[in-house]
Amino acid sequence: MAYSYTEKKRIRKNFGKLPQVMDAPYLLSIQVDSYRTFLQDGKSPKNREDIGLQAAFRSVFPIESYSGNAALEFVEYSLGKPEFDVRECILRGSTYAAPMRVKIRLIIKDRETKSIKDVREQEVYMGEIPLMTENGTFVINGTERVIVSQLHRSPGVFFDHDKGKTHSSGKVLYSARIIPYRGSWLDFEFDAKDLVYVRIDRRRKLLATVVLRALGYNNEQILNLFYEKVPVYLDMGSYQIDLVPERLRGEMAQFDITDNEGKVIVEQGKRINARHVRQMEAAGLTKLSVPDEYLYERITAEDITLRDGEVIAANTLLSHEVMVKLAEGGVKQFNILFTNDIDRGSFVADTLRADLTRDREEALVEIYKVMRPGEPPTKEAAENLFNNLFFSSERYDLSPVGRMKFNRRLGRPYEVGTDQKSREVEGILSHEDIIDVLRTLVEIRNGKGEVDDIDHLGNRRVRSVGEMTENQFRVGLVRVERAVKERLSQAETDNLSPQDLINAKPVAAAIKEFFGSSQLSQFMDQNNPLSEITHKRRVSALGPGGLTRERAGFEVRDVHQTHYGRVCPIETPEGPNIGLINSLSVYAKANDFGFLETPYRKVIDGRVTDDVEYLSAIEEVGTVIAQADSAVDKDGNLTEEFVSVRHQGEFVRMPPEKVTHMDVSAQQVVSVAASLIPFLEHDDANRALMGSNMQRQAVPTLRADKPLVGTGMEANVARDSGVCVIANRGGVIEYVDASRIVIRVNEDEMVAGEAGVDIYNLIKYTRSNQNTCINQNVIVNLGDKVARGDILADGPSTDMGELALGQNMRVAFMTWNGYNYEDSILLSERVLQEDRLTSIHIQELSCVARDTKLGAEEITADIPNVGEAALSKLDESGIVYIGAEVTAGDILVGKVTPKGETQLTPEEKLLRAIFGEKAADVKDSSLRVPSGTKGTVIDVQVFTRDGLEKDDRALAIEKAQLDSYRKDLKEEYKIFEEAARERVIRLLKGQESNGGGSTKRGDKLSEDLLSGLELVDLLEIQPADEAIAERLTQIQVFLKEKSAEIDEKFAEKKRKLATGDELTTGVLKVVKVYLAVKRRIQPGDKMAGRHGNKGVVSNILPVEDMPHDANGVPVDIVLNPLGVPSRMNVGQILETHLGMAAKGLGDKIEKMLKEQRTVLELREFLDKIYNKVGGEQEDLDSLTDEEILALAGNLRAGVPLATPVFDGAEESQIKDLLELADISRTGQTVLFDGRTGEQFDRPVTVGYMYMLKLNHLVDDKMHARSTGSYSLVTQQPLGGKAQFGGQRFGEMEVWALEAYGAAYTLQEMLTVKSDDVEGRTRIYKNIVDGNHYMDPGMPESFNVLTKEIRSLGINID
């Protein structure tokens, strides 16, 4: 087994017992793949499929003029290069986007002959399309955003009922709904009287037969579509019907049924059963004589014409009178509809009878009246409206998904055409579609078939970034189309080009609106790598076209059987969004139709294969799926007599031969965040939910520390999140410093004609969206060999390429003087001293100089009425120095604003300009450090409007950036030269010279000779071998090209820096100051474990006072044991024990290293740990002695262990490891009180738990106010920290003071401390003078009350 660079350094022992069938997939694929398919950027225009952007263009173009003489056709689109890269966009506050150009063809036809008269082709600029970064995010206006995927109801047809809630009788009313991808909804529904109604777009209901009439069917045709006929014969005064025994089953016999010999088969009043049916068939009965009463209330199936020409219409109810008419009219035979009360209800016939419309025209008018109330209906308007509703591809689109679901639900073949034409035809409804839906609805009402479960994942699909952007793009294009159509008629006469016709602004506006302000375009949660990944893998049922929090019921939010392996049953927010926002399971992916799929191994005849098949919830119906941990022998046969399986959403046991599939992994059920919780299987689900949510709030600590007890998913998350630097190609580390890594690439991975050098620039101390610090640290050394995919540098919260959200803490579960009451946490001062829970937060503060009506604001160090001391940290331009340590109230950027007292005349302006009387007419509006903030300035950026002169500081920053870039490029070229020189020496070594350079013809080129020459001289040598001479020429050409490319890069960078910045209107200059704030842990900060065990730090004790063991090792944290039993998250106890074993083993390894034991002894001990305690076996023999020593050195702090979710370490294994580490098998330790040295009464559970510091820091929440801003109307202090507000003294607090009888305190609260304007000014003066006298006046809110009463017309004094 081959280990990667980081794995060699620190192998994580895995306790998993199940074989790894497939690796966890790339975790961001749902975002990246979706947008890639949308853009199809890498493909040539000819090879582009009809999806994404291409489909959007194809669906709107060609655009024809109203006359049909001019048309615009779409040819192809191309995306340019973005102007700035991702980092520059974040810095400048711009959008990372590429310009899009579309080739459009204008065709003009001759008016008379309609032949093509003119064709013009032109590229049209269509605005910018935001590009996705490598990590699945978008940079919009300088901030990283994520487009969350939406889980919405799939288009198609759905049958449902109201569960008896609509009508007071409790009768179940059935309904059907056809939902298109875009267009009008069509609903059919029953009412309490069993008539069928139709609604279009949820408007007023009409009888369903109105729509059938509008489709062109008459009464007879409608009845034929829904009912079978029964012929009735009139023979010698009695009626006979054809006997179909099967139809009679279940009915009550209304008369005796006899055979041909008169023997009674069924007596009157008895129910006809299967035995009776068999007897009738045996007796050979073909006709049945029926009394007249039997035919009463039956329905005629067609128009019946009597002898005298009178017509009895179809759908007439038979009665005595009608029967007499038929007999007199000489009708010998007629058809009635086959209906009964059991499974052939007469619903459609009854509806048709209630329908007052007589023909198609009337039906269309009825529909028009509902859709356009108040407008006078005309025949054409009604016809057009109805056709446009469901039969026009412009207005209605079922989409391939909708058509597939529709056909599948109605039991038709569901292959969907892929070409544009068939997609248009299948996208609209046909007459048969509407009739089949109605027929199925009636069948369900008759008791055949089931209603749909709308929460089934086969009826909900995922709309990802690409699809949502495509929809927005289409919206923009349709707006363009409207405008273009009107202009096209001009194009025929005015000789216009495509550029003149198309205005791309609506497209750009639609895209901008979507990315900037859509509910699903969210500010990325960038607390740590896990929160980024989780945010990108989120699926939301909210958003446009989705649910709203208020309307979503319990069923939608609940866990559904189809969530298994597709959506995580654990990870969802607490609060109003619970169950509406979910996370994808680890192995889940969306298929082409947008349905979530999960992988399974195929099982054939009880034998498990390694073939993996992805199944959606629709395809999973009917399969029998065994669990991942089912017992299997070495040949893959299921060994149990009855296997525990899932079938039709139920957990049952079945014999192995019936099993069709098997889970690929035990982690398949849960999401990424939940799969990072060790011993998840021992935690209550509610606590696991809190645990997975709180891991996302963990703040990256100063030094990341890998978890001793992990799950094995840590490396996957760190790699896929994109925060680490990963080697694109293998090679040797040529150069490394804190901000750059250079790799000389392996020969076999190089592309012909390149120097084979990869340069990786690291991100240093950058601000994240949540103000945490993003910083990358190198983990490779000079000369190290790395392979493709190896981790070169750690990002925030990663340690050796593994996710490391918190710190391993030595915890004791015991009480300590009430300091861990109610989940409080007692910390040791050692944690503070070692900076283990210290984090760096970076704040961005902006100062904007605007052009005001009174003149321009100015950024300057010349500020009126400010002392020298306050300006000591500013430079001549008035901007703070980098490295300055600042506290609350310090000036960061000096800015003065013109005062608005007097409007100056031009003469006065001139005098002021000459004599510089600044102080009089400007006020200080400098940027100061906000209250409660203290930190170090780490960066300053100055942006100046294009056309304005840059100040000294801006020029200095620009120069520094250019110098740094020039240095980078020089070093880059130097590395290329070095690499080229080595290659040249390698090529020339041992060759014969043909002269050139300092060599003579026939010289043998030795290594000593060559290594003494410079590259220039080397390249002048002409070797005898022509192939090598050719190679040298190639290298020379390459270096020239590289040099030119570097010069070009530098010129481009210089141009970018020299041009002014695009600032919003009225803004002249923006200065951004970045403050780094160091936050140590302190009482009031929130901490948590990974099992939902959260608490607030109550006290930080000196190390010497903490409880310690017999060896004098103090604990870091004391937790309350009462926090475990009632919460049922026992996983934390198992983690603590296993953590103790991991640390104990690390201590033993450290002891061995100190005693300088032999490598062989080390190998043996490591072998015991990795290969003798169960779990996955490690190939330690493949490591060299040096690598074993390096590995042992990295294991000193503890041996990292992985206990995968649902496949983790067993109790016996934990005990074995504890024993191997020479620790008691109970996991409990005798502790002593640090203050008295006395032993505690009983042994205490002590071990190592991974604790996180959450982004709920007391520094951000603590806030105090004496005086400040007041509300305009009520004059009461504002609320909240952001407004520098006060604490609300509400109604209940007033009651408390009343209860104590504290009258003066109460008066003070309600007047001078609140809204008594004069009183508070007076008391402020008094306190300043040292006189604490209070003189309360009238509160302003009382004045407001009197004003409101007066506004009602009641005078009050």
Curated annotation (Swiss-Prot):
**What biological processes does GO assign it?**
DNA-templated transcription
**Gene Ontology CC terms:** DNA-directed RNA polymerase complex
Query: What UniProt keywords are attached to this protein's entry?
Result: DNA-directed RNA polymerase, Nucleotidyltransferase, Transcription, Transferase
Question: Coiled-coil intervals in this record?
Answer: none
The answer, when asked if Disulfide bond is one of the entry's keywords, is no
Q: Name one Pfam family in it.
A: RNA_pol_Rpb2_1
Catalytic activity entry: RNA(n) + a ribonucleoside 5'-triphosphate = RNA(n+1) + diphosphate
State the HAMAP family in the record: RNApol_bact_RpoB
Q: What is this protein called?
A: DNA-directed RNA polymerase subunit beta
